[in-house]
Swiss-Prot record:
PANTHER family: ISOCITRATE DEHYDROGENASE KINASE_PHOSPHATASE (PTHR39559:SF1), PTHR39559. Its EC number is 2.7.11.5, 3.1.3.-. Disulfide bonds: none annotated. This is Isocitrate dehydrogenase kinase/phosphatase. One of its GO terms (molecular function) is ATP binding. Its main location: cytoplasm. GO terms for cellular component: cytoplasm. It comes from the Bacteria. Pfam families: AceK_kinase (PF06315), AceK_regulatory (PF20423). It catalyses: L-seryl-[isocitrate dehydrogenase] + ATP = O-phospho-L-seryl-[isocitrate dehydrogenase] + ADP + H(+). One of its GO terms (biological process) is glucose metabolic process.
Length: 607
């Protein structure tokens, strides 16, 4: 039962609510400014600038939360505000959000501020937004006609599609000229005809495109949908810099699976300017019904909102399931304890209190590695993580063996409490949550010859794409990689990662005498950050099927020259091209030399 006050009698309550909303409004204004700046950086080809924008934006949220807390402490002694006043603060805040264009994000910001001031015993709907209070439906009706959430175009006929797409692209007003937009728009129309065949044009035949471009890595994406009769189809057109220095439309993506990969949890967040983010999410969910709202908000760079929605989805799942959390199957890690709920497609990772040999690390160092991944372009090859503190789980849902494992190996990370409903709970002080995947070592052990071949092809591609993005995985055992439902290999164990540019790529020196040659021990000096690619075969090529696949697809993997080549390019300032689709889909391959490739090289497929 709610205990909200009947009267809003406190001026301080209103002032605090206003201060908190001002903090959020500042955050979202800066968030949008970065997204607008991304367009300018893309136009001039400032790839390092785009990467810096991405890193800066990730830090914005916590900076604004901290600023708001400092203001509340200085002006209102926030820690001493009485419970009844906090309830009035929430009600005032709801009132201030009535006509707000980002109410769901503002509610999450309120939660972030409050939960860093008050004890977790207050984390309920009387004080924070456990459930949303303001609807986000149809907010777009109040948008400016100058830039609505999406624009509608009417080709009129199959023959009118090329001119329609030319108009769509021109409406984004990119400052850099196109190499041949008429040609590329014709390719888009041709690809659509090839995909759908000679389809019948319905009276409602139209194309909708979101009004802002989606920026990531070195690509700008037009995101849209085609409506014809009762059917809706996704449509994505990537725009890249060509070798000529001008812009080209690289391809058109029309398969829903392709779009799912584009919005995968293994990719960096998009930078996109949104006045009404909930309207963008609604549009994208129409294209990707299998994606949760939490996943889509996260892909749009609103990871705190995604994290909030994920937790609500998780609580809902707990209410409607009865299985128990268990220790995750597979080889135990030396740094993390990993557990899972079989009915829920995620794993929970807790840093151990003690690290057995040969691991030499600390809790803070491990957390810094995970933060590095959060800020880096994951190029479709590193799983995103959700980081939570003080998460309360029903103790009755934990397997006894898992509880003993946590008590033995991570006692400082857990405590017990009783909920307001009188239920025993286990509180995990710090946890990472990741999408559950099939460990690659299990995939290779149990797979058919064809699956093994695919797994090794993907593994080699994943490592090569990571080092091209300046990430050295460190521990490259197969158990540290997973296979997604799309068959892609993704890295997910980050405690040993380093920047490749910080590593010394070395060849094993020749033995100086017979004793060294016959020695089972390393006879040469190994310094910190030294890597010896030719030694990796010792722990990667034990299985004959794996060895055959490796030699077939990646014979250069164990050659130090390949690794040094990537390092040299990175040190020279090169930014690699990573696209989340097969190179065969590109117009340059489909329609010949008239379609020009990127300014540097053939992009890797990062999907």
């Amino acid at each position: 039962m709610s205990h909200f006050p009947k009267l809003l009698s406190s001026q301080i309550a209103y002032d605090v609510a206003r201060t908190m909303l001002d903090g959020f409004d500042k955050h979202y204004r800066l968030f949008r400014e970065v997204s607008i700046e991304a367009k300018a950086r893309f136009e001039v080809g400032d790839w390092h600038g785009l990467q810096q924008l991405q890193r800066d934006r990730i830090a914005f949220y916590n900076q604004r939360v901290h600023e708001t807390i400092v203001t509340l402490q200085d002006e209102y002694d926030a820690e001493d505000i009485e419970d009844e006043i906090w309830q009035q603060i929430k009600l005032h805040y709801i009132g201030l959000l009535t006509n707000h264009h980002q109410p769901e994000l503002a509610e999450t910001f309120f939660n972030s501020v409050f939960t860093r001031i008050q004890h977790r015993s207050y984390f309920n709907n009387d004080f924070i937004f456990v459930r949303p209070a303001i609807s986000t439906e149809y907010i777009e009706n109040e948008e400016s006609p100058i830039k609505p959430t999406y624009r509608a175009y009417y080709p009129g006929s199959r023959e009118g599609m090329a001119a329609c797409f030319e108009r769509i692209v021109n409406n984004f007003q990119l400052e850099r000229p196109f190499e041949d937009l008429k040609r590329d728009a014709g390719y888009v129309a041709r690809a659509i005809t090839e995909h759908f065949g000679e389809f019948r044009i319905a009276p409602n035949f139209q194309v909708h495109t979101l009004s802002s471009l989606f920026f990531r890595n070195k690509t700008a994406f037009v995101i849209g949908r085609v409506i014809n009769g009762d059917h809706t189809y996704p449509l994505v057109v990537p725009i890249i810099h060509a070798a000529s220095g001008k812009l080209v439309l690289d391809t058109v993506l029309l398969h829903r699976e392709q779009i799912l990969i584009l919005f995968s949890f293994a990719h960096a967040y998009f930078m996109v300017d949104m006045e009404i983010p909930s309207a963008y999410v609604t549009f994208l969910r129409d294209l990707l019904p299998r994606k949760s709202r939490a996943e889509i908000y996260t892909s749009l760079g609103l990871q705190k909102q995604g994290k909030n929605l994920f937790y609500r989805d998780f609580l809902h799942h707990l209410q409607h399931s009865s299985d128990k959390f268990i220790s995750a199957p597979g080889i135990k890690g030396l740094v993390m304890l990993v557990f899972t709920l079989p009915s829920f497609p995620y794993v929970f990772k807790v840093i151990r209190d003690f690290f057995p040999a040969p691991k030499e690390t600390t809790r803070e160092l491990v957390k810094s590695k995970y933060q590095l991944v959060k800020q880096h372009d994951r190029v479709g090859r590193m799983a995103d993580t959700l980081e939570y503190s003080d998460v309360a789980f029903p103790l009755s849902r934990f397997d006894d063996a898992l509880v003993r494992e946590l008590e033995q190996h991570a006692p400082s990370m857990i405590e017990y409490q009783r909920s307001k409903q009188g239920e025993d709970e286990i509180v995990v002080r710090h946890v990472y949550i990741e999408r559950r995947m099939t460990p690659l070592n299990i995939w290779l052990q149990e797979g058919t010859d064809e699956q093994v071949d695919h797994g090794i092809l993907e593994y080699g591609n994943a490592v090569k794409e990571l080092i091209a993005a300046n990430i050295f995985p460190g521990d490259m055992l197969y158990k540290n990689f997973g296979v997604t439902r799309h068959g892609r290999v993704v890295f997910y164990d980050y405690d040993e990662i380093e920047y490749l540019t910080d590593c010394n790529v070395r060849r094993v020196p020749a033995p100086r005498n017979e004793e060294e040659e016959m020695s089972g021990e390393v006879w040469y000096t190994v310094r910190p950050h030294d890597i010896f690619p030719e030694t990796y075969g010792t722990f990667l090529l034990g299985d004959p099927r794996v060895r055959a696949a490796f030699m077939r697809h990646h014979p250069d993997f164990f050659d130090a020259a390949m690794w040094q080549h990537h390092k040299d390019r990175l040190l020279a300032g090169h930014v690699h091209d990573f696209f989340a689709y097969h190179s065969q889909e590109r117009f340059i391959h489909r329609y010949g030399s008239g379609a020009t490739g990127p300014a540097t090289e053939e992009p890797r497929r990062a999907a």
